[in-house]
Structures are given as structure tokens and as C-alpha cells.
A protein has these predicted regions:
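Hydrophobic/aromatic pocket-lining and membrane-interface residues
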Residues: 1, 184
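His/Asp/Glu-rich acidic catalytic environments and adjacent acidic regulatory segments
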Residues: 2-161
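Active-site flanking loop/helix segments enriched in acidic
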Residues: 92-99, 128-131, 167-183
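Structured, charged N-terminal subsegments at the starts of enzyme catalytic cores
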Residues: 160, 166-167
Length: 184
């Protein structure tokens, strides 16, 4: 008993792949028992597996953006990583790549792909699921469906921002309070 809670040698495996109790016979067996139950306990091992899977999905002539911050975040979100590649409508590439990347990275935790020669953003992404799906095409389709409205929002705001020249916004900057005690 610790802090009023009972503890023991049993834990649960991955909630989809092995949703059963497993018994850990010794501290040294902990990682292996959970690996058999489809949970990668070692954060560095999980991170390396994600990086390997994501990189493997880039085609020849493509470079995947493996930013440390996104890789760390995704590593913390999954127990049994399975990387999948999806795509989006190339028409969205008329929006500045920074806006598209932000939508993919911040909202959906997707890794984006660039052309190896030109550096241009490609209409593709890589997501990391927490399951090895029996129907990966459906998982990809769902992710493609989810990113579409995010990219549409980015296109909408970019289009609206282009309606007014940048200089016309300068006047309003004087009334923006960045920090209450520092003024405008």
C-alpha cells in the first residue's frame, strides 16, 4: 500500500491490441512483459520507432520534417506507434506553406513532407496512429477527411488577409495592448 492505494504486480496492456491484465514477475521483466502486451514503455525506443516509421514513408525525392518538438509530442501520445501516409488536395498549396504546416503540426500532429530538390511543401502528410489497424486505408481516409477543414480554414483566413494591404493594418497596431503595464 502506498498513499492509501494498493499496488501489485499486475497491469493492463494496450487498450486495443491487448486489453487484458498482465503480470510483471520482476522489475527487470517490466518492459518485455508490456512489449508483449503491445506497449512500448521505453520512451527512447518508442521515439526511435516513430522516427524510423515516419522516415520510411517518405518516397524517393521527398524529405519528411521530423521536428524534435512534434516527435516528442507524438511519442507521448502513443503506446504502440503505427505511421501512415495520407494526402490532401494540391489546390491548398496556394496557401503559404507556413499556414498549412501549422495546421498539420499543431492541430493534427502530422509530419509534413517537402520536395528534396526545391524544398516545396508536398500535398502529403504522415500521421502516427496508436493502433496497427486491420483497415489502415480507413484510418488514412479519416485523417484526410479531418485535415480538409483545417486547411480550408487556413485558406479562408489567408484569403481574408489578402483583402487589405498590410500597411492598412499599421494604424490599428497603436491600440493593441501587448502587456497591460507596458502600454501599447
Amino acid at each position: 500500500e502506498l498513499f492509501g492505494l494498493n499496488s501489485g504486480p499486475s497491469t493492463r496492456g494496450h487498450r486495443f491490441h491487448h486489453n487484458e491484465w498482465v503480470t510483471v514477475s520482476s522489475p527487470g521483466a517490466y518492459q518485455e512483459v508490456l512489449r508483449d502486451a503491445k506497449v512500448l514503455v521505453d520512451v527512447e525506443e518508442r521515439r526511435a520507432r516513430i522516427a524510423e516509421q515516419v522516415t520510411a514513408l517518405a518516397n524517393k525525392g521527398e524529405v519528411v520534417s521530423l521536428s524534435d518538438d512534434l516527435l516528442d509530442e507524438v511519442t507521448g501520445l502513443v503506446e504502440w506507434p503505427a505511421a501512415l501516409r495520407g494526402s490532401f488536395d494540391p489546390a491548398f498549396l496556394s496557401v503559404p506553406s507556413q499556414a498549412l504546416i501549422s495546421a498539420m503540426k499543431t492541430h493534427q500532429k502530422y509530419f509534413h513532407l517537402n520536395d528534396a530538390d526545391s524544398g516545396a511543401l508536398l500535398p502529403a502528410f504522415i500521421t502516427v496512429a496508436n493502433i496497427e489497424s486491420q483497415q489502415p486505408d480507413q484510418v488514412v481516409s479519416g485523417n484526410e477527411r479531418v485535415i480538409r477543414p483545417r486547411l480550408s480554414d487556413a485558406a479562408f483566413f489567408f484569403s481574408n488577409d489578402k483583402q487589405s494591404p498590410l500597411i492598412s493594418r499599421q494604424e490599428r497596431l497603436g491600440s493593441v495592448v501587448f502587456q497591460q503595464k507596458l502600454g501599447s
